[in-house]
Amino acid sequence: GYSKSIELGSVGDIRSVIRSQQWDLVINCVAIANHEQCESDPSSARLINQELPGMWADQAWQSGSRFVHFSTDAVFDGSSADRYFEDDATGAPSVYGQTKRAGEEGVLSADPDAFVFRTNFFGWSHDSARGILDFFANGLESGASMTGFRDYVVSSLYVGHLFELMIEAL
């Protein structure tokens, strides 16, 4: 596979990666997804969640590559008693949701044919410490007391299934 360290926010570095090969597909799944981190460091959230996706999409579009961007259901305000659809009004109350929505807009402005997957997914993290499955598995294994939410409704999708759906959509 391809691996290269780049300076986040550097259009030159992004361009270098995109133009290093003829990519059929460029997938952006980079994000600051920790809501608390976004609230405490909104400037980093704006760079990673809002500005970078459009930069990647623009460079992919210029090189003729298809572009996929992963967003979130947190772009909605959560006030609906029913499920949300793509064309429903957004109105995220959090920095995370606001920056992810702005990132979607940047992607679609740079490449109107880009795929934007607005989803909530789960899976195992590479270090077994950061995903929701890791949280519960590690907590159960250690006998730790865990608390959750009773008033939060979400329809999460396993990342393996999300990948299959993405391939099917392309």
Language model features: what each stretch is:
Residues 1-7:
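A short beta-strand-loop structural module common to alpha/beta enzyme folds
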Residues 3, 46, 161:
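Catalytic phosphate/metal-binding cores of nucleic-acid and nucleotide-processing enzymes, i.e., regions
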Residues 8-50:
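NAD(P)H-binding glycine-rich loop region in Rossmannoid oxidoreductase-like domains
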Residues 17-21, 59, 106, 165, ...:
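CheY-like receiver
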Residues 26-30, 67-73, 117-119:
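SDR active-site strand-loop-helix element
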Residues 40, 47, 51-52, 75-117, ...:
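Catalytic helix-loop patch of NAD(P)-dependent Rossmann-fold dehydrogenases
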Residues 62-66:
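A short helix->loop->beta-strand "cap" motif at the edges of active sites that frequently abuts
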Residues 105-154, 159-168:
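NAD(P)-dependent short-chain dehydrogenase/reductase
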